[in-house]
C-alpha cells in the first residue's frame, strides 16, 4: 500500500540526517487498523495518544482534525497519488499555505495539481526514491531558510484556491440567469 512507500521514504530521510515526524492521516477511518500494523510503535490519535519528542511516526486516525494537522505541518505529502487512485483534492492544502508533494496519479484533480505546480506550491514525484530526494531538498531549505518554498509561491496558490472556490457560485449564477422567468398569478 501507499503507506509503505511513505514509511520507507521517511526512514531514508531520517538516515540522511533529517529527523522529522511523519503523520499519516487516513482519508477513511476503516483503514486505520491496517496502517497501524505497518507502524506498531507509533502513537494513535484515536487512542488519545500523542507523539513524543523524537518519535518519527504518528497515526492521526481521528475525524475533523485535518486542517489543524495541515496548518501545523511544514510539508504535506498528499495521498491517493502514489497508487492509481487519482490523488486527493489538493485545494485544502493550498488554502492553508502548506507546501505539497504528490505522487504521479492525479487524474481526479489534474487541473488543480497542474496549476499549483505552476505556482510552485506543489511538486510531483514519481516514486519513493524521488520522494526522498524532494523531502531532503525541502527539509534542508527549512533548516537553512526557515521555509521549504518561497512565501510568494504559497500566496499565489492561495489566491488560486480562492478563485477555485468561487467557481460553483459563478456556475450557479449562470444557470439561474438562463432559467425562464415565470409569472405567478396573484
Task: Name these PLM-found stretches.
Residues 1-186:
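Nucleotide-activated sugar donor-binding and catalytic core shared by glycosyltransferases
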Amino acid at each position: 500500500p501507499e503507506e509503505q512507500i511513505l514509511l520507507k521514504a521517511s526512514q531514508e530521510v531520517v538516515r540522511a540526517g533529517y529527523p522529522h515526524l511523519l503523520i499519516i492521516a487516513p482519508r477513511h477511518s476503516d483503514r486505520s487498523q491496517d496502517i497501524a500494523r505497518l507502524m506498531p510503535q507509533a502513537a494513535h490519535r484515536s487512542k488519545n495518544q500523542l507523539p513524543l519528542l523524537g518519535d518519527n511516526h504518528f497515526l492521526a486516525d481521528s475525524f475533523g482534525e485535518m486542517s489543524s494537522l495541515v496548518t501545523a505541518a511544514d510539508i504535506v505529502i498528499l495521498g491517493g497519488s502514489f497508487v492509481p487512485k487519482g490523488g486527493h483534492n489538493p485545494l485544502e492544502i493550498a488554502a492553508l499555505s502548506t507546501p505539497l508533494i504528490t505522487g504521479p496519479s492525479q487524474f481526479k484533480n489534474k487541473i488543480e495539481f497542474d496549476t499549483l505546480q505552476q505556482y510552485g506550491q506543489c511538486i510531483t514525484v514519481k516514486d519513493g526514491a524521488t520522494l526522498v530526494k524532494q523531502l531532503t531538498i525541502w527539509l534542508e531549505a527549512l533548516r537553512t531558510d526557515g521555509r521549504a518554498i518561497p512565501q510568494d509561491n504559497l500566496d499565489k496558490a492561495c489566491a488560486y484556491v480562492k478563485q477555485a472556490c468561487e467557481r460553483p457560485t459563478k456556475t450557479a449564477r449562470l444557470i439561474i440567469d438562463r432559467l425562464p422567468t415565470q409569472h405567478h398569478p396573484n
